[in-house]
Amino acid sequence: MWYSDYHVWILPVHERVVRLGLTEKMQKNLGAILHVDLPSVGSLCKEGEVLVILESSKSAIEVLSPVSGEVIDINLDLVDNPQKINEAPEGEGWLAVVRLDQDWDPSNLSLMDEE
């Protein structure tokens, strides 16, 4: 698992396919997640642009995508259960799956450690 400067984790699941989610640290900073606005399956995301909007007990934030590609799956469970992000941000609280528009090369990303 890789951690982007956008506080989004990146988990390769297949060749040129990654799962994305909010880091543990960011979900703690946000407090209770109350609402999630997910992208549409089939939509395109671009590195550094808004992927997801989260509303929490403390604020609303735009979560930026650390990669570019096509959204091929979203976590629909979050629509009715946004608290899954708080309960398991690096597990069942994942946000989206993206098919990358280029080969996976983490050295091209701006990365940080888990903290």
From Swiss-Prot:
- Give the co-factor note: Binds 1 lipoyl cofactor covalently.
Q: Which gene encodes it?
A: gcsH
Q: Which SUPFAM superfamilies match?
A: Single hybrid motif
What family is this protein classified in? Belongs to the GcvH family.
Record has NADP as a keyword: no
Q: What is this protein called?
A: Glycine cleavage system H-like protein
InterPro entries referenced in this protein's UniProt entry, alphabetically: Biotin_lipoyl (IPR000089), GCV_H (IPR002930), GCV_H/Fam206 (IPR033753), GcvH_Chlamydia (IPR017514), Single_hybrid_motif (IPR011053)
The signal peptide, as residue positions, is none
Q: GO cellular component terms?
A: cytosol; glycine cleavage complex
Q: Where is the Lipoyl-binding domain?
A: 17-99
Q: Which cysteines are joined by disulfide bonds?
A: none
State the UniProt keywords alphabetically: Lipoyl
